[in-house]
Amino acid sequence: MLWLYRDNRHAEANLRNEAAARGIDPSRLVFAGPLPHGDHLARHRVADLFLDTLPYNAHTTASDALWAGIPVLTCRGKAFAGRVAASLLTAVGLSELVTQSLDEYESLALRLATDAPLLRGFRQRLERNRLEFPLFDTDRFCRHIEAAYTTMWDVWQRREKPRSFGVAPHGEVIRPNGNPAAQHRQAGTDPG
């Protein structure tokens, strides 16, 4: 079964017609309408695998699926909008679900659909990783964004031109030359 979002009756009819033309029972396409967010997340329990789209990846929808425990399969696109799911999967420790071509995507989708232990293994890893990897670590995200804001403010206060910098895993700023600079010196807080 393929579960899709119900948004456009014309698209729904076209997809059902295309399925029938390819010898697939159109009733195997299930279209689900909008629900309140909590109910929407709850219905994820009946899904086995989230198949991402190209050229525009799922963004919040993929994040919701991962939070609900559904492995997401994606194909890395060429532009930002086609690389979001790859970033999400990397941040939750499941980069093996990021494919580099549509042929690879199709092959892995078929393997996951027919190899229950393989799919179960990804589900179990996702369950373990969800609270241990950066994707859903709100405290870490806050430390990093605060470090970035502090650095931008410091640069502006010194009347320097805006410049590139990164934020290290423990909330330290990485200057372009690679030397970490301690954060929150004005606030006196521990960036760790």
Regions found by a protein language model. Give the residues of each.
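Hydrophobic targeting segments
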Residues: 1-3
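C-terminal amphipathic helix plus adjacent low-complexity
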Residues: 5-7, 12-21, 30, 35, ...
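Flexible loop/turn segments at secondary-structure boundaries
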Residues: 8-12, 38-40, 58-61, 80-82
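Hydrophobic (often cysteine-bearing) scaffold residues that line and stabilize catalytic clefts
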Residues: 11, 43, 47, 81, ...
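Structural motif
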Residues: 21-24, 42, 89
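Catalytic binding pocket for nucleotide-activated donors in carbohydrate/polymer assembly enzymes
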Residues: 26, 53-138
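Conserved active-site histidine-acidic residue motif and adjacent donor-binding/catalytic loop
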Residues: 29-42, 57
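Acidic donor-binding loop of glycosyltransferase active sites
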Residues: 45-55
